[in-house]
């Protein structure tokens, strides 16, 4: 169920009161004081009238039809569902993964990533540019939301900083964040938390460090379409209208997905292991291949 927050930012859930400053009128119009809540305040639930709602089946069908090339729509649907249960999946073997949508300029790769994220949050929120965003900002994004995908755009083998690249290897796979000393003195060590799944976009596949990142992700090629038909344009616009909370929104679809959490917690571990065992029997088990099989087994489960 959904429990609404009041104007002071207080919500009662399961008999306990919680204070959410990002949604409190205390901070409304307070200028710089509200800047730290700017991103968090975008994560809202919208009650959509029944006659305007898009069902899960309709949303999935649109995703599949709009991004039909190379079955990218199917990959996007699967990963969007996986994101909703990232916390439940990651804790099984401390493993997760990420899709890497690779294609030329204007191929639509970023739109696929935004469509995945739009199940959770408004598509109008800026995505993270790996070329101009700071290392610290990326680290903060990873811990801001739990199970809400972050889009990392403009991956480039040549220009990406080594700190970002090494961080990505942990973020997309085992969820390990950067270790650092707590404070300027002392011996306490703290880890940057990684709670968010990511979707990466770029014009080239990651090939640094002997393909260390590439073996942890699923590469989905997005070729540039030569000619879009009128029907394809209309389907794309329809999907984007549905994704926009100002027009319709997907809150009810996300609720349908989240209701599956008990089933995911009960069956996912066994299904993932079964998928991995089947892949091991069919393929030669080398180091890099083994990592790819573990990654693929998450989608198969």
Language-model region placement:
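Segments of Walker-type
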Residues: 1-71, 207
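Conserved AAA+ ATPase small/helical "lid" subdomain
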Residues: 243-301
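Short coil/turn segments at secondary-structure boundaries
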Residues: 2-11, 76-78, 183-184, 268-273
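Conserved NTP-binding/hydrolysis core of motor NTPases
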Residues: 74, 83-260
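Helix-boundary capping/turn motifs
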Residues: 51-55, 147, 271
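Glycine- and acidic
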Residues: 43-46, 56-70, 92-102, 152-154, ...
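Short, hydrophobic/amphipathic alpha-helical patches that form generic packing surfaces
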Residues: 72-87, 293-301
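Surface-exposed acidic, glycine-flexible loop patches that form ligand/cofactor-binding
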Residues: 2, 10, 89-93, 141, ...
